[in-house]
Amino acid sequence: MRLDQFLSARTMYSRRELRQMIQKGKVTVDGAVVRKADQAVQPEAHTVCLNGREICGDQYLYVLLHKPKGYVSSADEAGQKSVLELVPPELCRKDLRPVGRLDKDSTGMLLLTDDGQLAHQVIAARGHVAKYYHIVLARPWEDGYLQSLEQGITLADGAQCLPAKAAPVPDTDREALICLHEGKYHQVRRMFAALGNHVSELARDCNGRTCCCRLELPLGACCVLSEKDVQKLLKCETDFARFATNAPKSFVIMDKCTSRILGNKRLEKCFYFWYDIYVTGNGKRLSRGDVLENLI
């Protein structure tokens, strides 16, 4: 494969722009500057860098972005700043698109990929990929919310939501942790509107278990995920099954992810709060080390 062909398929640059960059010495192959656009490269055998950044040679690219407020999760809303603007040009492939969406005023982890099949798996409810949120409510959490969410909320337009897991954050009366397995438009906000409350702040912490527990991405930053990370995302329900069937297992995982990403000490405390009521199916209490070993 020609060098310019390889780069064209994996960046947003045109062939003409890439040839100019190659001639200016901005491209290296295995550490050596290459100035010929027709240089032969093999994605699986060579390391190609553009402007000092390694270009992913895999067929598909998976990028995890910590979305800040003020950006929309699409590329075609006129006059709006897109999350794609936060991805370095060397990583932004032509078909790179967000998987699902976070609205403009929300923050959180957003997966971007050019793998259409994986995107469908994550978005579709039948894919069973969990999505985790930390929310702040305008009014205090009410005891009846948990039962309503677990039964499935009916939205104002009549749409029926799948059952959701939820729990208030200890030592607060307006913060909660939410776990969904679907992605309707503005779903979390609409669910609490149906309950007579309002979501003031919303942050999505991760999809599934996508290596978030090992990342501390600042707002606006992104990183490339490995194929292994992506498989963790798709197998999150299998991982959950290792824990007790009668325990709030999704929140144990979510709390730990949240505290690692955001450095939120109160959510770290929430993790240990859930640990205190966390028991195995035979009634044997897990040690804190056992739980952490399974999370990381």
Give the residues covered by each predicted segment:
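Basic, flexible Lys/Arg- and Gly-enriched helix-loop patches that mediate nucleic-acid binding at interfaces
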Residues: M1-F243
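Short, positively charged and aromatic/hydrophobic N-terminal segments
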Residues: R242-T245, V252-K256, R260, Y275-I277
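Cationic, low-complexity basic patches in intrinsically disordered or flexible, solvent-exposed regions
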Residues: S250, C257, R266, C270, ...
